[in-house]
């Protein structure tokens, strides 16, 4: 296994080599050549020498672009598995992007990823913590996602829709999630409709990470900005099929999965600084001999106070995902969370999954300055039914069911801070603590789970990565927790 020192020297050598290429390209640039495509506005107080890749990219031919990202995160979980086990480690992730656009209507996009963990003692050197030098994205796109009315894509790509409660790349994880996909997007001003057929790419020991045969995911996802005033209306239909497979823990021992999810996501703003966000899903189909009948719902609302010095936003959230009340019967009511970006959706500690769950949260977000943002939140978790399991963020069983036991999983406190120099460079740190409730005290050793962390994220351009298919733009001022 490559050592931390060797890995750091390799990345440093790559960074310095790119810097030298950028300077050499600058010295040899023909003053009469065509200017590079304009980049999004970036903070003027950010020194350009911090972004040598951006300088090199500006001097490459118009049809060729390079970019990428480097991220470090220290984590020190305490109470792993609700026991006295602790760990402290460094997560390291490097992504390199190459985009080729010979025509406005034709794009080839490639991205490799190297994710590693160092200094760990109890956390495994495996997905989702480590997956070295893998093909993360690789696709060809015909048509433009920002002009015209249709484009088509085939290859390996990250999928991201709505609030990522159902489909997302799970970017907080060191490895994350990507798909082998074929998709067609129809778009005009005010709407986009995506039709796709895909298969999630699992972690494995191979560089290409071939998908599991028969584990397929199909969908039609619409996004309309002209139906709800000052809001977005997103209906969707998803179809998932999967074989019995030990790599799919939610299906182990139950049989073949054939499941349809019908959902609706609506979010927007209201007068007087109020905002709202809702999403509801219903599921039907079969899982082996079981008939599926499950549902989930999320409702959130907030109120901003822009006239206050820190411009706080106070918010409330409620979240429900059904569970199976009678495991001996033929009805399967456990909600399938599909492929979400779960981080912070069910707590920042990422110990709770959206299956057999009741959650309530209250919090406040504040801007200490233009670059500093903080957030504090408190939430409670309960099992929807004590006859079903307690599920982890991954969807796997965290603690088996104990019928008749208390449904109270615990309460969580989250304290989060982020300093964003610009879209290219930002830092963050925080602390989350899940206080064990009666259920965890009864079914485990009952230790609280604590999650302190600190991270640095560096994009190769101070304007952020702008290449590849635009799936959804980040709203102005959006939190990146």
Q: Where are each of the predicted segments found?
A:
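Residue-level signature of outer-membrane beta-barrel architecture
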Residues: 58, 72, 98-104, 141-144, ...
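Signature for the C-terminal beta-barrel architecture of outer-membrane proteins
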Residues: 30, 146-152, 169-328, 387, ...
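N-terminal periplasmic/intermembrane-space "pro-region" immediately following the signal or transit peptide
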Residues: 2, 9, 15, 22-87, ...
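Outer-envelope beta-barrel architecture signal
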Residues: 60-66, 104-108, 148-150, 189-191, ...
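Gram-negative outer-membrane beta-barrel proteins
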Residues: 74-80, 106, 116-122, 160-165, ...
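C-terminal structural cap/anchor segments
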Residues: 313, 318-412
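Surface-exposed loop and membrane-interface regions of Gram-negative outer-membrane beta-barrel proteins
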Residues: 40, 76-92, 102-148, 161-169, ...
């Amino acid at each position: 296994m490559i050592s931390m020192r060797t890995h750091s020297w390799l990345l440093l050598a790559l960074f310095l080599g790119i810097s030298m290429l950028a300077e050499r390209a600058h010295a040899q640039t023909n003053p009469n050549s065509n200017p590079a495509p304009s980049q999004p506005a970036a903070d003027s107080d950010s020194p350009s020498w911090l972004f040598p890749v951006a300088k090199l990219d500006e001097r490459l031919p118009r049809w060729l672009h390079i970019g990428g990202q480097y991220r470090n995160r220290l984590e020190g979980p305490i109470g792993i598995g609700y026991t006295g086990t602790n760990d402290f480690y460094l997560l390291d992730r490097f992504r390199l992007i190459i985009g080729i656009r010979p025509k406005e209507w034709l794009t080839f996009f490639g991205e490799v990823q190297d994710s590693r963990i160092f200094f760990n003692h109890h956390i495994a050197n495996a997905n989702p913590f480590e997956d070295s030098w893998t093909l993360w994205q690789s696709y060809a796109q015909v048509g433009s996602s920002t002009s015209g009315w249709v484009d088509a894509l085939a290859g390996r790509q990250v999928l991201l829709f709505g609030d990522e409660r159902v489909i997302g790349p799970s970017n907080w994880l060191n490895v994350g999630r990507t798909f082998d996909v074929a998709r067609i997007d129809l778009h005009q001003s005010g709407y986009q409709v995506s039709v796709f057929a895909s298969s999630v790419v699992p972690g494995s020991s191979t560089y290409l990470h071939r998908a599991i045969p028969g584990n397929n995911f199909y969908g039609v996802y619409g996004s309309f900005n002209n139906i709800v005033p000052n809001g977005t209306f997103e209906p969707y239909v998803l179809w998932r099929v999967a074989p019995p497979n030990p790599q799919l823990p939610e299906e182990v021992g139950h049989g073949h999965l054939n499941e349809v999810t019908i959902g609706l996501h609506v979010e927007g703003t209201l007068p007087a600084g109020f905002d709202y966000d809702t999403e509801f899903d219903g599921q039907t189909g079969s899982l082996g001999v079981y008939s599926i009948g499950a549902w989930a719902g999320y409702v959130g609302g907030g109120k901003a106070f822009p006239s206050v010095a820190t411009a706080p936003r106070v918010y409330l959230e409620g979240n429900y995902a059904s569970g199976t009340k009678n495991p001996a019967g033929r009805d399967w009511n456990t909600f399938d969370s599909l492929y979400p970006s779960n981080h912070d959706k069910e707590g920042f500690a990422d110990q709770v999954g959206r299956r057999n769950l009741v959650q309530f949260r209250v919090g406040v977000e504040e801007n200490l300055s233009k670059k500093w943002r903080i957030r504090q939140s408190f939430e409670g978790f309960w099992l929807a039914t004590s006859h079903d399991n307690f599920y982890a963020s991954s969807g796997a069983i965290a603690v088996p069911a104990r019928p008749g036991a208390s449904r109270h999983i615990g309460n969580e406190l989250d304290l989060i801070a982020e300093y964003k120099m610009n879209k290219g460079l930002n830092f963050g740190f925080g602390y989350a603590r899940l206080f064990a409730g009666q259920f965890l005290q009864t079914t485990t050793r009952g230790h609280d789970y604590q999650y302190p962390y600190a991270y640095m994220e560096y994009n190769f351009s101070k304007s952020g990565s702008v290449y590849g298919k635009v799936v959804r733009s980040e709203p102005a001022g959006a939190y990146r927790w």
